[in-house]
């Protein structure tokens, strides 16, 4: 007769009318009983002949691929101009006084962050943008390319210009400025234009047709064409000094950017050298078709314009363009869907490539990528914006994988001890938290993303993919990529991106300048960074609490007025460090804080409402007597495991599921086991914070007997049959709790101390978890344990009762020291930004 749910409850001693604990509990440790119950509940029967179920509610299991959904309306999120202050340590010290060793060490880790992989695999550019959405390939290509461009403009990526140089936007850091090579350097010298151009390889104008043309003018100017020098001098508006524009005249195709030329330029002396203007000209940056502009170290923009297309000779005379897009302009349309129709929509398609404001030298970087990118929804609640997923999983795989640093994540009890209080709470949202932390340029060659350009991408996706040679293709090859699909897609995208279509159709290689999300190093660095900042804030405001986990920062204060003034001063402090907060997402929680999926109040901690709802839905959909694929079980256990500490029996109740996942077998829920779990999760009990106190109750056991010391009373008992020592110690602790009701129990057994009861016989683990819920344990060495003698059957000998103090732990969670009082170098009255004295009047 199968075990009914009522009977099972009684067996687990979850009902009040159970017999004396000393008799009932040891039975649950019996292997025979555990085996019989497992058979009754169908827990052990793992090899089943019925086909497995692969979907339960929203949980999918084996052999199911979740197809990501492409949204053609995705918006690219905007990124603020994030620049974390380089002297962050000094700024913190001005704010709070000398930093602790821990804080300094953590802040030095991220200024700048460094990345040392064991081995880097380079992938061809075709793999830069993953063909994740074959139906929307072109649309996805441009949206991703636009996202990358946005990141580059926000100073989050470097753009590879040549093998050894890169450009970026935003404010440079000192470790980026040291790399002077590759700038346009203005040197003041008395000789006037003698070495007007020094041609050194720098990669600023590499591969552009301007190179040879400028050279030819130099020869002319050396031959004494004076008017030329005059114009140069005027171009500098009278500054004496020779201009060094390091021009790289190579014809070798070092990949990275396609030439920015707009066709062949003859050696007319009018084009380049008279175009060296002051930075005022920057406004007309793209007035000509191709402009390569550079910010030089003295702040002048040096621009080399090619002649505008209007005066360019007809294409038939000159050589073929190397720009795939612009070649369509002069070719005959091959059909109604020829791309030349789109290219002829605009006269001026803008530059072929854009260059950043700053140029730096980088270690040798090949024209390859090290990870692919694709777009997904920003999060389940926000499907209008996209998020870029970067796959750098190569660094976590194989024998050469990087072992990422481990860091402490606060566990539930530590979190409760720390945050369960009667404070008012608010949480701050750090916008684009990962992109705050700068990476050293030496990491760039390992973290490359990019794309091979539209023609290669389209050719790779089309079934008739020929190996087209783009260097010297014929017009026929050019039209190979024309198709109705491409035409329609580009026409729609033209509405969104306009002339940017041209820029985005070129190949590009980008390296990360700030830490990317797809690398195991990033969460570690972010956790170090925010915990150090919170540590500083806690010391600046000793009467308040600041705590963070990754990019989630919470502030707590005694009253709402305190909290508001704390909020103002902390926000200003964070902004002064260059940390960007998202003011729209600041949440005020009142007295119950929502953090890391929990609700934490003065009464303790519970899971958030949306998780409780998910669990209810999960049980509603859970089939009975049908084998469920272990992958689905994994997902179910993930959800239930999060809320397990809030149930009567805790994790031990899920042990049968864990066992089936480990053996990769299907699991069949019997009606009784499902009803048992259902009841467990219907009534959730808060996890309360531990209180400090003196331990007065001690438990000890031998394999044959148990002993307790409760105050000055001593008790002992024997087991019917000898038990494993850990089991005996656990039973003794349960007896101590039920006899004395004490929340603090001294024990000398490390397994009992750890409060992980998953390795005990299943029924005993479940029952013990309920009996010992909310109990704190103190370690007492065996030699000093007052319960040691009674457990050996000696009641007459009294060891003196220990005074064992118990301090609740906050684990290794980034709280270094108890916050000291405000450092002494501040004025004695009160810190200017302190909300401590709301009604403070000057003396």
UniProtKB/Swiss-Prot annotation:
One annotated GO biological process: symbiont-mediated suppression of host innate immune response
Chain positions covered by the region annotation Spacer: 178-346
Pfam family, one: DNA_pol_viral_C
Keyword Nucleotidyltransferase: yes
A GO MF label: metal ion binding
Disulfide feature: none
E.C. number: 2.7.7.7, 2.7.7.49, 3.1.26.4
PROSITE patterns reported for this sequence: RT_POL (PS50878)
Polymerase/reverse transcriptase domain (RT) as annotated region, ranges: 347-690
Protein's UniProt keywords contain Nucleotidyltransferase: yes
Annotated catalysed reactions: DNA(n) + a 2'-deoxyribonucleoside 5'-triphosphate = DNA(n+1) + diphosphate; Endonucleolytic cleavage to 5'-phosphomonoester
Source species, domain of life: Viruses
Domain Reverse transcriptase: 357-600
Residues noted as binding Mg(2+) in the record, renumbered to the chain: 429, 551-552
Region (Disordered): 218-243, 290-316
Miscellaneous comment: Hepadnaviral virions contain probably just one P protein molecule per particle.
Identification of the protein by name: Protein P
Protein's organism: Hepatitis B virus genotype C subtype ar (isolate Japan/S-207/1988)
Taxonomic lineage: Viruses, Riboviria, Pararnavirae, Artverviricota, Revtraviricetes
């Amino acid at each position: 007769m199968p075990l009914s749910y009522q009977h099972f409850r009684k067996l687990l001693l979850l009902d009040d009318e159970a017999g004396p604990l000393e008799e009932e509990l040891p039975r649950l440790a019996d292997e025979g009983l555990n085996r019989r119950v497992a058979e009754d509940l169908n827990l052990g029967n793992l090899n089943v002949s019925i086909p497995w179920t692969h979907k339960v509610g929203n949980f999918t299991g084996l052999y199911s691929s979740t197809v990501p959904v492409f949204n053609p309306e995705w918006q690219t999120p905007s990124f603020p101009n994030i620049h974390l202050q380089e002297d962050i340590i000094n700024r913190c010290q001005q704010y709070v006084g000398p930093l602790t060793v821990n804080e300094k060490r953590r802040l030095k880790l991220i200024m700048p962050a460094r990345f040392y992989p064991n081995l880097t695999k380079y992938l061809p550019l075709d793999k830069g943008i993953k063909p994740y959405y074959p139906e929307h390939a072109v649309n996805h290509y441009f949206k991703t390319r636009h996202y990358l461009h946005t990141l580059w403009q926000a100073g989050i990526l470097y753009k590879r210009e040549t093998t050894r140089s890169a450009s970026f936007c935003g404010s440079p850091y000192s470790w980026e400025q040291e790399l002077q090579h590759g700038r346009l350097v203005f040197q003041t010298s008395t000789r006037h234009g003698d070495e007007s151009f020094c041609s050194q390889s720098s990669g600023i104008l590499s591969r552009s047709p301007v190179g040879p043309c400028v050279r030819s003018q130099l020869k002319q100017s050396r031959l004494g064409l004076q008017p030329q020098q005059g114009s140069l001098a005027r171009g500098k508006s009278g500054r004496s000094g020779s201009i060094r524009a390091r021009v790289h005249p190579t014809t070798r195709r070092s990949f990275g950017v396609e030439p920015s030329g707009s066709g062949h330029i003859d050696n007319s002396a009018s084009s380049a050298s008279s175009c060296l203007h002051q930075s005022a000209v920057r406004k007309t940056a793209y007035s000509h078709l191709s402009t390569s502009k550079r910010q030089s170290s003295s702040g002048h923009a040096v621009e080399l314009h090619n002649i505008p297309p209007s005066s360019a000779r007809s294409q038939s005379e000159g050589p073929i363009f190397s720009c795939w897009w612009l070649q369509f302009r002069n070719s005959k349309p091959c059909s109604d869907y020829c791309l030349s129709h789109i290219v002829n929509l605009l006269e001026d398609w803008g530059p072929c490539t854009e260059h950043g404001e700053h140029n730096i030298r980088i270690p040798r970087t090949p024209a390859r990528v090290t990870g692919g990118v694709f777009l997904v929804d920003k999060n389940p609640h926000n499907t209008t914006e996209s998020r870029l997923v970067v796959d750098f999983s190569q660094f976590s795989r194989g024998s050469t994988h990087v072992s990422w640093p481990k860091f402490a994540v606060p566990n539930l009890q530590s979190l409760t001890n720390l945050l369960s209080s009667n404070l008012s709470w608010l949480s701050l949202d750090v916008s684009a938290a990962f992109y705050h932390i700068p990476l050293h340029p030496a990491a760039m060659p390992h973290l490359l993303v990019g794309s091979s350009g539209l023609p290669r991408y389209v050719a790779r996706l089309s079934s008739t993919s020929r190996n087209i040679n783009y260097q010297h293709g014929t017009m026929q090859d050019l039209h190979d990529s024309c198709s109705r699909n491409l035409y329609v897609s580009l026409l729609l995208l033209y509405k969104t991106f306009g002339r940017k279509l041209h820029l985005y159709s070129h190949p590009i290689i980008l390296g990360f300048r700030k830490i990317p999300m797809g690398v195991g190093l990033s969460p570690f660095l972010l956790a170090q960074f925010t915990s150090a900042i919170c540590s500083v804030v806690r010391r600046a405001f000793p009467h308040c609490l600041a705590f963070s986990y990754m990019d989630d920062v919470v502030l707590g204060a005694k009253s709402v007025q305190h909290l508001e003034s704390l909020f103002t001063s902390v926000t200003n402090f964070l902004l002064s460090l260059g940390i960007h907060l998202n003011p729209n997402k600041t949440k005020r929680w009142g007295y119950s804080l929502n953090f890391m999926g929990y609700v934490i109040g003065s009464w303790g901690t519970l899971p958030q409402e949306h998780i409780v709802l998910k669990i209810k839905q999960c049980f509603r959909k859970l089939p009975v007597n049908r084998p469920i694929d272990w992958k689905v079980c994994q997902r179910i256990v993930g959800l239930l495991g999060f809320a397990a500490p809030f149930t009567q029996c805790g994790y031990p109740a899920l042990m049968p599921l864990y066992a089936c996942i480990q053996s990769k077998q299907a699991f069949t829920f019997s009606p009784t086991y499902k009803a048992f779990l259902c009841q467990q999760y219907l009534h959730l009990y808060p996890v309360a914070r531990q209180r400090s106190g003196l331990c007065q109750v001690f438990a000890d056991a031998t394999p044959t007997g148990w002993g307790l010391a409760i105050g000055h009373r001593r008790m002992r008992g024997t087991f019917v049959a000898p038990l494993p020592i850990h089991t005996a110690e656990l039973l003794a602790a349960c007896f101590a709790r039920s006899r004395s009701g004490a929340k603090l129990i001294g024990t000398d057994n490390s397994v009992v101390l750890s409060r992980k009861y998953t390795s005990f016989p299943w029924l005993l683990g479940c029952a013990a978890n309920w009996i010992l819920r909310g109990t704190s344990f103190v370690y007492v060495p065996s030699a000093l344990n007052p319960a040691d003698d009674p457990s050996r059957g000696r009641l007459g000998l009294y060891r003196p009762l220990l005074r064992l103090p118990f301090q609740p732990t906050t684990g290794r969670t980034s709280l270094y020291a108890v916050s000291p009082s405000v450092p002494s170098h501040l004025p004695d009255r009160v810190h200017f930004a302190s909300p401590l004295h709301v009604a403070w009047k000057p003396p």
